């Protein structure tokens, strides 16, 4: 019985010090309108897609804040809450900063600390600047090869659109929404990266692929 109590107390301690649980305590009682304000303010700190503004959950938002700002998630949440004229005090112990994705050359070394947005941003830049790819980026580059074969006509139309308007802001990517949506979007935009520039390609990726879809793809990539 004493042993069970120790286990129970230990679990409660973990729950009370987990950054996700601490941040969630401040979000869980917000009204829908208040949460919408929080989401829009969060866009100053997080990469949100268009669909995230209507579909992101409190749990996903918290996970993204903790992942993007592991050392400052408490400060970021406090700043975000100022949009509601609320002054909150979040006491969270900091941890080591996540390792930049560019340092990882092989899939076996991938960890939870790597951000998919880092991988994609660096990958698009490498493609635009014709920088030799390491094994991890070669794995991602297979999606570009697939896109060339599968979307040759659509890629031509996207290039024509960009050459005419100088951007892809209002261009709808011809990628069907299914379990391959994230990887196909990466591949399609990677082909366009030398033409439109890696920055525009990256922001189109953020605009189109939601945080939830990015997380699902990251788990799939890490499981292989």
Curated annotation (Swiss-Prot):
Entry's induction text: Expressed in the early phase of the viral replicative cycle.
Keyword line: Early protein
Domain of life: Viruses
Family membership: Belongs to the orthopoxvirus OPG034 family.
Name the UniProt record assigns to this protein: Protein OPG034
Species of origin: Vaccinia virus (strain Copenhagen) (VACV)
Gene that produces this protein: OPG034
């Amino acid at each position: 019985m004493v042993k069970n109590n120790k286990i129970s107390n230990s679990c409660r301690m973990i729950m009370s010090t987990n950054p996700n649980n601490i941040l969630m305590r401040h979000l869980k009682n917000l009204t829908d309108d208040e949460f919408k304000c929080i989401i829009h303010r969060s866009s100053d700190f997080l990469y949100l897609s268009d669909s995230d503004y209507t579909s992101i959950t409190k749990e996903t938002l918290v996970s993204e804040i903790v992942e993007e700002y592991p050392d400052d998630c408490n400060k970021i949440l406090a700043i975000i809450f100022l949009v509601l004229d609320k002054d909150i005090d979040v006491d969270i112990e900091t941890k080591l900063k996540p390792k930049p994705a560019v340092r990882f050359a092989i899939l076996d070394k991938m960890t939870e600390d790597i951000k998919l947005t880092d991988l994609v941003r660096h990958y698009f830049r490498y493609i635009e600047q014709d920088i030799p790819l390491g094994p991890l980026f070669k794995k991602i580059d297979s999606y570009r090869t697939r896109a060339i074969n599968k979307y040759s006509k659509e890629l031509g139309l996207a290039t024509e659109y960009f050459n005419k308007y100088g951007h892809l802001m209002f261009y709808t990517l011809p990628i069907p929404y299914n379990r391959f949506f994230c990887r196909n979007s990466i591949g399609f935009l990677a082909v366009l990266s030398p033409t439109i520039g890696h920055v525009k390609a990256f922001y189109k990726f953020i605009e189109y692929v939601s945080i939830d879809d990015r997380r699902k793809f990251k788990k799939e990539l890490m499981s292989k």
